[in-house]
């Protein structure tokens, strides 16, 4: 009607990444090719934070002026950018980064040199820290007539769901509470209607992020590299 083209595709799941172990990473960017060179050097420590999918923390532990303040601020900025663009363009969360050491050159150090040093140290740290894919988990509640309980439970299990409990709904039916990965919930409304002759209803809301199984992580990583 309005002559506007739309890109239509499957809904996207907001996967994230985190790390499983604490590591120390260092990168020294030093180049000399006649005239002014390039020099930037940072040492960082990375460690997992409490799970929650909320973000990351950067702590400046530089002492004695081994890196000038302007380059420390730049390292923080670069790490913040990379925390949202690492590997498969996924946000990195629940990671604490400490800038613990480094060095600079009075003449050769520059913003570019420290950008490169900080970015490579971050990437090397992520490689060493056993990165893991996190997927959003939904709290799902299904209200269904009792005769369809088996079909509802079986379908939730096929969707990698974990059933947390069942209650009477007060009108002769059952209320099922479960946690299910968001990626498995696409098309659920249609499937539920079909399995229960339209007599069951459901609701869902975000609950948490949880580490995805290895085969899911591999598939997501491969798809996002394309």
Curated annotation (Swiss-Prot):
GO terms for molecular function: GTP binding; ribonucleoside triphosphate phosphatase activity; translation elongation factor activity. It is found in: Cytoplasm. One of its GO terms (cellular component) is cytoplasm. One of its GO terms (biological process) is ribosome disassembly. InterPro entries: EFG_III/V (IPR035647), EFG_IV (IPR047872), EFG_V (IPR035649), EFG_V-like (IPR000640), Ribosomal_Su5_D2-typ_SF (IPR020568), Ribsml_uS5_D2-typ_fold_subgr (IPR014721), Transl_elong_EFG/EF2_IV (IPR005517). Keywords: Cytoplasm, Elongation factor, GTP-binding, Nucleotide-binding, Protein biosynthesis. SUPFAM superfamilies: EF-G C-terminal domain-like (SSF54980), Ribosomal protein S5 domain 2-like (SSF54211). It comes from the Bacteria. Gene3D superfamilies: 3.30.230.10, 3.30.70.240. Pfam families: EFG_C (PF00679), EFG_IV (PF03764). Transmembrane segments: none annotated. Catalyzes the GTP-dependent ribosomal translocation step during translation elongation. During this step, the ribosome changes from the pre-translocational (PRE) to the post-translocational (POST) state as the newly formed A-site-bound peptidyl-tRNA and P-site-bound deacylated tRNA move to the P and E sites, respectively. Catalyzes the coordinated movement of the two tRNA molecules, the mRNA and conformational changes in the ribosome. PANTHER family: RIBOSOME-RELEASING FACTOR 2, MITOCHONDRIAL, TRANSLATION ELONGATION FACTOR G-RELATED. Belongs to the GTP-binding elongation factor family. EF-G/EF-2 subfamily. This is Elongation factor G. It comes from Neisseria gonorrhoeae. The gene is fusA.
């Amino acid at each position: 009607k309005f002559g506007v083209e739309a890109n239509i595709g499957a809904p996207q799941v907001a996967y994230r990444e985190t790390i499983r172990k604490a590591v120390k990473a260092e990168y020294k960017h030093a180049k000399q090719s006649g005239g002014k060179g390039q020099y930037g050097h940072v040492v960082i420590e990375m460690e997992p934070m409490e799970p929650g999918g909320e973000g990351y923390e950067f702590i400046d532990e530089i002492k004695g002026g081994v890196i000038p303040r302007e380059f420390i601020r730049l390292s923080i900025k670069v790490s913040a950018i990379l925390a949202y663009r690492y590997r498969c363009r996924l946000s990195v969360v629940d990671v604490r980064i400490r800038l613990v050491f480094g060095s600079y050159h009075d003449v050769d150090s520059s913003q570019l040199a420290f950008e490169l040093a900080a970015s490579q140290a971050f990437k090397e740290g992520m490689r060493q820290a056993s990165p893991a894919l996190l997927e959003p988990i939904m709290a799902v509640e299904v209200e269904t007539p009792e005769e369809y309980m088996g079909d509802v439970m079986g379908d939730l299990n096929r969707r990698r769901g974990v059933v947390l409990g069942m209650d009477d709904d007060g009108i002769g039916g059952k209320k099922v509470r479960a946690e299910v990965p968001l990626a498995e919930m696409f098309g659920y409304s249609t499937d539920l209607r079909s399995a229960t002759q339209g007599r069951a209803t459901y609701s869902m809301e975000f609950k948490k992020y949880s580490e995805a199984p290895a085969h899911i992580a591999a598939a997501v990583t491969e798809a996002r590299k394309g």
